[in-house]
Structures are given as structure tokens and as C-alpha cells.
A protein has these predicted regions:
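Bacterial N-terminal signal peptides
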Residues: 6-16
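Eukaryotic scaffold repeat domains enriched in small/polar residues
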Residues: 23-373
Length: 373
């Protein structure tokens, strides 16, 4: 068994270094099995006949009985429907990300209960995605410090961020300008994510084209920004996700740069200081920060990775592509207050639920994000 583990570790080190970036290989740390069991076929279909889930790009577990989903429209199924169809496009070996001509802008936002059944369908907001030439919704978040539990939805393609009431009945705020990309204080260019500081400030990961993180005050007024395009300390080749941790720490995933950039807040609310970078990833996708560690998902190979705040790899488990329970991409993940894990697949087109194994080492379980519990 030991030679196989060593071989896997060597493979991970080899593929984790982005092309064109010469660097010392990063020790992978322990590699082992997932500490979770999948709840098979949890995400129950509710689309009209002829359609399936689209790319599940955003998942946020507000509670064990309310899981918010942002999906990139629905996927038009082939007709006649093959017998092997199992409730999601991936079961037909169809990739909802690459087969964009089958995308239909309907049921873009909805919620699920603990059993994976649809609770709310926010179809009144489908028009905010209609006509999009690209993937559209990218993340869905709620600030742990917001008593009103407003829902933030980032639309990458339209360069906009929408803030909804908790029940989805009202659109409270629109940031950015639809179809207008810009690098000034009022515009975005392919925004990707949003995070929240305890004092009410908001961090906008902006994004794939602007390569910056924008800082807003509690009233959503511009304060400052940090980052910039490049491979140097604190720069980005594309900010894909962002999260906040204790001690004023800010963790931003530099997707194309294959690293995590770490910053810290300062006494000046408009400025942060660069702390460190954690290199050696291929395409880091999403992040959850806990009290003393953080978890990310990475692509090529698809995996969950746990690190401490110094960047040391503490544990890794690989995510297989094999169906019925596999993934092509864990684009987003979330954990509820009961410790259940949810992972959205942007390519197979579904969200899966995982429960901790009875014999799991608790140190290997992902907890709800810092500040949320």
C-alpha cells in the first residue's frame, strides 16, 4: 500500500505546479480517503420534462433544511431521452459547461430542503440571466453578520452583483452595470465571489479580468482595493474565490496562478497587508476557512485539501469522476450546522450531499465557515 500512496503523492506534486511557474515542489502531506459518505441521488429533479439541472456553480447551506443553489440555467436534454438517464446530464456523459448551446435560462435560483427536494423557486429573477452569452451566475453567499440574511448572487458574465431579501421576493441592490465591464469604482470585470468582514465591510473578488479585490464599507461605498494582475506577491492571475478567517486574515484563491494569497486587515479600513502565498495548486476553486485551518477544492486532480494558516498541507482526499457518485468539478462547496457537506458540480450538473462517516476522524471534517457558526 505504501508504494501506491507514494506514487499518488508524486503525481499530485507533479500536476500541482502550474505550467510556466518554476518553483520548489510543495509537500502534499497525508493523502487518504474521504471522511464522508455520499447520500446517493439526494438532489431530486424538479425541472419540466426535457430539462435537467445546469451547472451548479453556487451552493450555500444557510441551515440543514435550507440550501441555496445558483445554477447556470437548466440543460436541454436529448429527445428521445436515453434509458441510462439518472436525473442529471452527467449520467448521459454530457457536460453542461461545454455544451452551452443546450443552456436555457430558467430556475437559476432555488432552495432545497434537507432531503434534496425543491422548496423555493426564484423564477421571478430568471430574467436577470436571460440573454447571457456566457455562464452567468457564479456564487451565492450570505453574510454571517447580517441579521436580515440577505442573499448575494454574483453574475460573472453580466459584471453584476445582486443582493436579494432572504425570501427572494425583493431585489434590494444591484452592484455594477449589466454588460458593462470596467475597472473603476462602480464597475466589475467578471466578478467571482464576495466575502464579509465582522465590522460590516464587504470584499468583492473582481475577478478574472480586473485581478483585484475591492473593499466596500457597510453601506456598500467604495473604500479601496488590492491585488493587481501579475505573479508577484499579492497579485493575481484571476481571483476565483475569497474567504475571511480569524485575526483579520483574508484568503483569496488565485485560480490561474495556482496559489492562495493571504492578506491581513490593518487599522486603515481601506487597506490590507500581504502576508504570504501558498503555492502548488493547479486550479483552486472554492474555499472554507475554519478556526485554525482552511479547506479548498482544486482541479487536476480533483481534490479537497486541508491547510493550516502557515500553508502546511494537513490532509488531502481525491474526488473520483466515476459515476454514480463522482464529480468532474467541485466548483463550490458548503457545510451546514450539522456538519453535512454539499458540493456543486459545474460540469456533471448537480449538487451532492455528504454526511460524516461514523468512524471519521473529526479533525478531517470540514466545519461550517468561521463566523457562521
Amino acid at each position: 500500500m505504501m508504494p501506491r500512496i507514494c506514487a499518488v503523492a508524486a503525481l499530485l506534486i507533479a500536476v500541482s505546479i502550474p505550467a510556466g511557474r518554476a518553483q520548489t515542489p510543495v509537500p502534499e502531506g497525508p493523502i487518504g480517503p474521504s471522511p464522508y459518505n455520499v447520500v446517493r441521488a439526494w438532489h431530486q429533479p424538479f425541472a419540466a420534462p426535457g430539462f435537467a439541472f445546469g451547472g451548479n456553480s453556487g451552493v450555500f447551506a444557510e441551515s440543514p433544511d435550507r440550501i441555496l443553489i445558483a445554477q447556470r440555467g437548466e440543460f436541454r436534454l436529448p429527445d428521445p431521452l436515453p434509458a441510462e438517464y439518472a436525473g442529471f446530464a452527467g449520467s448521459l456523459k454530457m457536460n453542461v459547461l461545454t455544451l452551452a448551446d443546450r443552456r436555457v435560462w430558467q430556475n437559476c435560483l432555488y432552495t432545497l430542503d434537507r432531503n434534496g427536494r425543491v422548496k423555493e423557486r426564484w423564477t421571478q429573477w430568471d430574467h436577470l440571466c436571460e440573454g447571457s452569452p456566457g455562464p452567468g451566475p457564479h456564487r451565492i453567499r450570505i453574510s454571517p453578520y447580517d441579521r436580515d440574511k440577505r442573499v448575494w448572487v454574483i453574475n460573472e458574465t453580466f459584471n453584476t452583483i445582486y443582493v436579494f431579501s432572504s425570501d427572494g421576493k425583493k431585489l434590494l441592490k444591484t452592484l455594477g452595470e449589466k454588460n458593462v465591464a470596467g475597472s473603476d469604482r462602480a464597475h466589475f470585470a467578471k466578478p467571482q465571489d464576495v466575502a464579509f468582514l465582522p465590522d460590516g465591510r464587504v470584499l468583492i473578488a473582481d475577478g478574472l479580468d480586473n485581478h483585484r479585490v475591492m473593499i466596500l464599507d457597510k453601506d456598500l461605498n467604495y473604500l479601496g482595493e488590492f491585488g493587481g494582475n501579475g505573479k508577484g506577491p499579492g497579485q493575481f492571475s484571476g481571483v476565483h474565490a475569497i474567504a475571511v478567517g480569524p485575526g483579520g486574515r483574508i484568503f483569496a484563491l488565485d485560480r490561474s496562478g495556482g496559489r492562495i494569497n493571504v492578506f491581513r486587515t490593518t487599522k486603515d479600513p481601506a487597506k490590507v497587508e500581504f502576508v504570504a502565498e501558498f503555492p502548488g495548486f493547479s486550479l483552486p476553486l472554492d474555499i472554507i476557512v475554519n478556526d485554525d485551518s482552511l479547506w479548498i477544492t482544486d482541479l487536476k486532480p480533483l481534490r479537497f485539501v486541508k491547510l493550516d494558516f502557515s500553508g502546511k498541507r494537513l490532509y488531502t482526499w481525491l474526488v473520483p469522476p466515476d459515476l454514480p457518485d463522482g464529480y468532474l468539478e467541485v466548483h463550490t462547496f458548503s457545510v451546514d450546522s450539522d456538519g453535512n457537506l454539499y458540493g456543486g458540480d459545474n460540469q456533471y450538473g448537480r449538487t451532492q450531499k455528504f454526511v460524516p462517516r461514523p468512524d471519521a476522524d473529526k479533525a478531517l471534517l470540514i466545519r461550517a465557515p468561521w463566523g457562521q457558526r
